């Protein structure tokens, strides 16, 4: 997916234009592989105050973000230095979730529910995915009213047939400046974590899911390994998604049975693993694809698997 950037106007000389035309086949070949830009991940719950308290107790105080334009949900945000963020979503009125694509998740206390990737050419990306044979729902406008009264607006497009951002990510394009939507939260300024690095996506059939992502984004074969607590993993180097398929039952199998294929864990980036481990009292250190991974106390996070990855 193309990186968001400011438009740049320029003039091309005839020679430059000719060179571009001559190299177009090579450029087209290279563009077949799409790099995703992770925008944000979502955690749903039945009560926003409860969600905020859970993450505050874990050492990352969320900022209240305001109600969404659908009149059904509201959110809080943990914004990181790299402009990615964790979104906490809950109904405005307790138990009233009709009209939200994540209604079934908001019946729970706290559960990972979606992931999104960003673009500044949403319609182009929708067209590309359709040509690749990926089902895409018509783009929709969305908005949120911040506590200061400012309206934040965007466009989204959902992929596949599940809930938004369940297996393939939903796509989001800002219609207002991005820094209206996310800024680094005071609760993580100067913290040893800098953003959301990976989404761990629970899947039933690893081979089928690998094929789906390769079809959508033109990626090469992933690296695979097995982790006792998750099952068999597949990682596409340089991309933000790790696929996880269970074996011999376990919590991941149970979760897939209840919610289907959705995110099951999120990993935050760090350049100082020791400092992150100390600050957040991480545990269960393992090595995933050559990187250290350790976890927040899942009990304190009411079952949410949130980890840190790095060196």
Predicted regions: what they are:
Residues 2-14:
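Bacterial N-terminal signal peptides that target proteins for export
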Residues 11-24:
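Bacterial N-terminal signal peptides
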Residues 27-38, 43-63, 80-311:
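Glyoxalase I/VOC metalloenzyme domain signal
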